[in-house]
UniProtKB/Swiss-Prot annotation:
Transmembrane segments: none
Protein name, UniProt field: NADH-quinone oxidoreductase subunit I
Source species of the chain: Methylobacillus flagellatus (strain ATCC 51484 / DSM 6875 / VKM B-1610 / KT)
Pfam families named among the record's database cross-references: Fer4_7
Stated family: Belongs to the complex I 23 kDa subunit family.
Length: 163
């Protein structure tokens, strides 16, 4: 008799259905873990790789020495740099563009920079309404760096022992 009932349950997959419903019921009454994004924010790691920024030295001079290592190491070829020689025989960038539609946010540009000029910030909620809005130029990158310099410096200090 019991084997017939088991066979009936197995043939109609009722046992699996009951197991599935029990699992669903258990999670239905459990505590919710969903974060309602625009209203609630989760903590972001100091190592988060978000929007790029160009940094300056404390005296106001931009750090980039136009070595073009970041452009060479970028696997997506998202960085474009043009430079010129100055009178004191140092190079400075005249053009520094990052195409965020191509960028894969791998962080190679940040790792390869010898003067810590290009960094990736914690900013992840930016948008563009047109494709051209996501091409960040040198003044835009410097503005991001100037605005978030304190946070960038704190993140770099927190991560210093791992570099």
């Amino acid at each position: 008799m019991i084997s017939k009932i088991k066979e009936l349950f197995a043939s109609f997959m009722l046992l699996e259905l009951v197991k599935g419903m029990a699992l669903t019921g258990r999670y239905f009454f459990a505590r919710k873990v969903t974060v309602q994004f625009p209203e609630e924010r989760t903590p972001i790691s100091p190592r988060f790789r978000g929007l790029h920024a160009l940094r300056r030295y404390p005296n106001g001079e931009e750090r980039c020495i136009a070595c073009k290592l970041c452009e060479a190491v970028c696997p997506a070829m998202a960085i474009t740099i043009e430079s010129e020689q100055r009178e004191d025989n140092t190079r400075r960038t005249t053009r520094y563009d990052i195409d965020l539609t191509k960028c894969i946010f791998c962080g190679f540009c940040e790792e390869s920079c010898p003067v810590d000029s290009i960094v990736e910030t914690r900013i992840f909620d930016y948008h563009g309404e047109k494709r051209g809005d996501l091409i960040y130029t040198k003044p835009m990158l410097l503005a991001v760096g100037d605005k978030y310099e304190e946070q960038i410096a704190a993140d770099r200090a927190a991560d210093a022992r791992y570099r």
